[in-house]
Amino acid sequence: MESLDDIVREIMSCRKCDLHKTKTNYVPGVGNEKAEIVFVGEAPGRDEDLKGEPFVGAAGKLLTEMLASIGLRREDVYITNVLKCRPPNNRDPTPEEVEKCGDYLVRQLEAIRPNVIVCLGRFAAQFIFNLFDLEFTTISRVKGKVYEVERWGKKVKVIAIYHPAAVLYRPQLREEYESDFKKIGELCGKKQPTLFDYL
């Protein structure tokens, strides 16, 4: 089986599309290579491009906070994107870019073989749902629902939620977002810390 390190090395010298010409850093992914849960976003933004790590800006801060709310740290999970390079001006990925770069994500998932895959936002959900032959309509329709697929000789849970950037942009989604993370915590056998956990 291919190792995650081998895939990351290949990403770091990728020339499959023109995004490598405009990026500052490749952003392959970060976290635990034996993670039970993988979070998949759309593409690196400005902060991620500068640092070479996914979800390090304001959206990343919210993601880290939500992980902590269910007793997880970034080091416990694996975080990546469909695209490994930033599209100029944060424009939407093109179908060609998704097709060429998406292969890396498929191989990353194959190397990690998680029990839970969380799609952060519409692009990630479209890609993952397509990969697992699940019907995707809109993010608001599939959001928060748990789908079960057979993969790697086991049952894998797939859940789509809003991208953290959408929650920052629309604070009224926050309560719903927290509820979705509780559900993710339950899928991983985690619960929200209570006051008694700190006594």
From Swiss-Prot:
Coiled-coil regions, chain positions: none
Keyword vocabulary terms for this entry: 4Fe-4S, DNA damage, DNA repair, Hydrolase, Iron, Iron-sulfur, Metal-binding
SS bond list: none
Binding site for [4Fe-4S] cluster: 14, 17, 85, 101
InterPro entries reported for this sequence: Type-4_UDG (IPR053423), UDG_Type-4/5 (IPR051536), Ura-DNA_glyco_family4 (IPR005273), Uracil-DNA_glycosylase-like (IPR005122), Uracil-DNA_glycosylase-like_sf (IPR036895)
Enzyme Commission identifier(s): 3.2.2.27
Alphabetized Gene3D superfamilies for the sequence: Uracil-DNA glycosylase-like domain (3.40.470.10)
Record's keyword annotation contains ATP-binding: no
Temperature dependency: Extremely thermostable, maintaining full activity after heating for 1.5 hour at 95 degrees Celsius. Exhibits a broad temperature optimum for activity around 80 degrees Celsius.
Ranges where the record places region Pseudo-FCL: 77-114
Impact when changing residue 86 to A: Shows reduced activity for uracil removal only within double-stranded DNA
A Pfam family assignment: UDG
Stated regulation of activity: Product-inhibited by both uracil and apurinic/apyrimidinic sites.
Catalytic activity: Hydrolyzes single-stranded DNA or mismatched double-stranded DNA and polynucleotides, releasing free uracil
Annotated binding of uracil, by residue: 41-43, 55, 81, 163
pH dependence (record): Optimum pH is around 6.2.
A single MF term (Gene Ontology): 4 iron, 4 sulfur cluster binding
Outcome, altering residue 91 to A: Loss of the iron-sulfur cluster
Domains (record comment): Contains a pseudo-FCL region, a large solvent-exposed peptide region containing an alpha helix and loop anchored on each end via ligation of two cysteine thiolates to a [4Fe-4S](2+) cluster. This region is involved in DNA binding and catalysis, particularly in duplex DNA contexts.
The family this protein is said to belong to: Belongs to the uracil-DNA glycosylase (UDG) superfamily. Type 4 (UDGa) family.
Function statement: Removes uracil bases that are present in DNA as a result of either deamination of cytosine or misincorporation of dUMP instead of dTMP. Can remove uracil from double-stranded DNA containing either a U/G or U/A base pair as well as from single-stranded DNA.
Name this polypeptide is given: Type-4 uracil-DNA glycosylase
Organism: Archaeoglobus fulgidus (strain ATCC 49558 / DSM 4304 / JCM 9628 / NBRC 100126 / VC-16)
Origin organism lineage: Archaea, Methanobacteriati, Methanobacteriota, Archaeoglobi, Archaeoglobales
